[in-house]
């Protein structure tokens, strides 16, 4: 069973009238985020360009959680549009508007209209690390093999 946590959401003036982020299927990990651009002023992303797209929402995440802003696979596959800093992290102490940094890797301009699903948001538990300086690390079969070292 998946845990459900309560998250307070503030709808900003330019987000009024848009539905809240929602899961599209019973087992979806992410909720779709919608573009809160003006209805009479869609945002056009030219090839190679990027822009911050507002969602009209602010969150109060509980301590120990983050929101990850991830691409929607359909936008990437069909149009080459993706989240530039994927995954974007929204920390539990951030109270500003959730914006999505989109980039158009496609060859055609892409128009973002009000209410369009532009990204997905995954709520995830956060583990905090305590780093400890050492002069040696435990040995592994992989060792220091990096990029491409485990094969194709």
From Swiss-Prot:
Record-listed E.C. numbers: 3.6.1.23
GO molecular function, one term: dUTP diphosphatase activity
Keyword list, A-Z: Hydrolase, Magnesium, Metal-binding, Nucleotide metabolism
Superkingdom of origin: Bacteria
Residues that coordinate or bind substrate: 72-74, 85, 89-91
Enzyme class: hydrolase
Pfam families: dUTPase
Reactions this protein catalyses: dUTP + H2O = dUMP + diphosphate + H(+)
Pathway(s) annotated for this protein in UniProt: Pyrimidine metabolism; dUMP biosynthesis; dUMP from dCTP (dUTP route): step 2/2
Residues annotated as signal peptide: none
Similarity-based family: Belongs to the dUTPase family.
PANTHER family with a match to the protein in the record: DEOXYURIDINE 5'-TRIPHOSPHATE NUCLEOTIDOHYDROLASE
Primary role: This enzyme is involved in nucleotide metabolism: it produces dUMP, the immediate precursor of thymidine nucleotides and it decreases the intracellular concentration of dUTP so that uracil cannot be incorporated into DNA.
Protein name: Deoxyuridine 5'-triphosphate nucleotidohydrolase
High-level lineage: Bacteria, Pseudomonadati, Pseudomonadota, Alphaproteobacteria, Hyphomicrobiales
């Amino acid at each position: 069973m998946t845990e459900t946590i309560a998250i307070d959401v503030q709808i900003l003036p330019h987000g009024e009238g848009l539905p809240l982020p929602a899961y599209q299927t019973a087992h979806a990990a992410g909720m779709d985020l919608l573009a809160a651009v003006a209805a009479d002023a869609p945002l056009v992303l030219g090839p190679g360009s990027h822009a911050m797209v507002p969602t009209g929402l602010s969150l109060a995440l509980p301590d120990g959680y983050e929101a990850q802003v991830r691409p929607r696979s359909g936008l990437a596959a069909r149009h080459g549009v993706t989240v530039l800093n994927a995954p974007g992290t929204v920390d539990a102490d951030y109270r500003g508007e959730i914006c999505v940094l989109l980039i158009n890797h496609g060859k055609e301009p892409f128009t973002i209209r009000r209410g369009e699903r532009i990204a997905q948001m995954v709520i995830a538990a956060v583990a905090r690390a305590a780093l400890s300086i050492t002069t040696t690390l435990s040995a592994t079969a992989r060792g220091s093999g990096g990029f491409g070292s485990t094969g194709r």
